[in-house]
């Protein structure tokens, strides 16, 4: 029997989408933007201490190999010729920090994840040394001094991990965010791997000047970071190197394919949603929640707690675009917490069913500040709370409150963005794994009181990376000209409650947020000076109140 003929679908482009919770490899038709096949692997997170979040860089890399291999197998089963994959793009969780040995190729410590809080004391120490004025870091980077960004994570590694210190002394250390680690490994690693990053990822390190688009010497000196360990900064769309995978790895089918696109995941989603015009915005619902608004070639600095960041630069000679961003630490992660920590649900999909059973939180409010509060508060002392509980409250109400929390946090960011831009959004474009939850999308429309618009193909983060890779000079299989971009079908969610009810729910949520603040400090419990014991008036009041209560009961003869 003659072998079946492989299908020819026009040039194909692959995309590695490496997120906090999972890794995926997806393949698109560059002429239609159709998703042809993909594979996903969940990634473990480690929590060695309270507030610490780590991942194994080698597990992340092997998950990429596995996803490439399995996706290629699936394409073969569909009779699609994988030799037609002309380029590969990378999108990645931002800020997560890796340091590795360029001689051995081994990571020198686990990846310190963007959610990690161990650097709060480092941040407080650095804030006391800011030269000149408190705007020193933000004016150059668009970012507040926070545990969120890579510079303080790298500073912690240099201060606390002897292997990292030794490798830096011996000129063997390389630093990078996840994109750098993957591109270096996929282009050969110790055998000529390319050590680079793109402008969007560099802009999240707190070491990168978003005006000059270069590593900033003053910032590196302030944080005490040796510049020789930093990756070369490139545009988001150019050929960085060719796939060069070890023969021991089955994913070698794509050997020699150029890696030609790289964007931090939120910038990739902005591109994938085709938000190329000033004022266009998207919100991605993943582990966290990230609302970006394209501000064009101009850096717009927020007065309301938002970040200024690089949106994209789609080619070496192309202009840079900036964005205002609101970041929420915990969105999809709250669903994972309900599943893994509380056991309220067995699968993430169950939460929609539970929420649908009651259709209300019944006055229960959930502030999932597990890693403090990000935009617009930037309050690391906050911690998660569930309040408004009664004897009537059950797991369905808590599930509903968890979904509402994601929507309320988005509302806070959108309000801040409207104040900064002066032009309220008429609708919100959304993407990310959580958008498959129809109750969440309807809640979001109700709480924002504007329509929520969701593309029928939700993989916009990977699509953005694929578009950047396919459009790169020397590849040229994907046109980004407006007239050539494929039309995307959309699902639209209209508000179904009145504006007054929306405002009442939102104002009650704001009260709950205030109650979540001020729960922790960086003061060591070993210092012998914890605040609860320092308050003599409070202690005296509690003891004397108890004495009076006991005395009153005794006098009145109450048993």
Curated annotation (Swiss-Prot):
GO molecular-function terms, A-Z: ATP binding; glycerol kinase activity; metal ion binding
Entry's localization field: Mitochondrion outer membrane; Nucleus; Cytoplasm, Cytosol
Membrane topology: Single-pass membrane protein
Protein keywords: ATP-binding, Cytoplasm, Disease variant, Glycerol metabolism, Kinase, Membrane, Metal-binding, Mitochondrion, Mitochondrion outer membrane, Nucleotide-binding, Nucleus, Transferase, Transmembrane, Transmembrane helix, Zinc
Pathway given in the UniProt record: Polyol metabolism; glycerol degradation via glycerol kinase pathway; sn-glycerol 3-phosphate from glycerol: step 1/1
Enzyme class: transferase
Intrachain disulfide bonds: none
Keyword Disulfide bond tagged: no
Binding site for ADP: 20, 24, 287, 332, 433, 437
Amino-acid positions noted as binding sn-glycerol 3-phosphate in the UniProt annotation, renumbered to this chain: 20, 94-95, 148, 265
Residues the record lists as binding ATP: 20-22, 287, 332, 433
Transmembrane feature ranges: 532-552
Record's protein name: Glycerol kinase
Organism from which the protein derives: Homo sapiens (Human)
Organism lineage: Eukaryota, Metazoa, Chordata, Craniata, Vertebrata
